[in-house]
Amino acid sequence: MITTLDLLNRLCELKQVHSTREVAKVLGIGHTTVQNWRNGTTMSDDLACEIAEMLGLDVDLTLLAILAERSKNQRTIEVIERVIEDKKTA
């Protein structure tokens, strides 16, 4: 399942950027937001969808993965993971 950090790393590869400030500039956000992602916070749903589109990923699956990453409820996480797997195999 994709995570905020996975999305960030893939975006860095795609756009050939390496610094926090460069990534922030590509996304039009503050560099502290990107730094927070590197330190373990999750990105917003809107940005996750925007980055998924840039990367050519399934936006729905990406959004579900970010919601699971953010969730503190194990049952919720398991349900989301199951839905993601079902959609991948459909």
Q: How would you label these PLM feature ranges?
A:
Residues 1-22, 26, 60, 64, ...:
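A short, Lys/Arg-rich alpha-helix, primarily the initiator
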Residues 40-54:
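Short, basic-rich loop-to-helix N-cap that marks the start of a DNA-contacting helix
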Residues 63-90:
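Short, charged recognition helix plus adjacent turn
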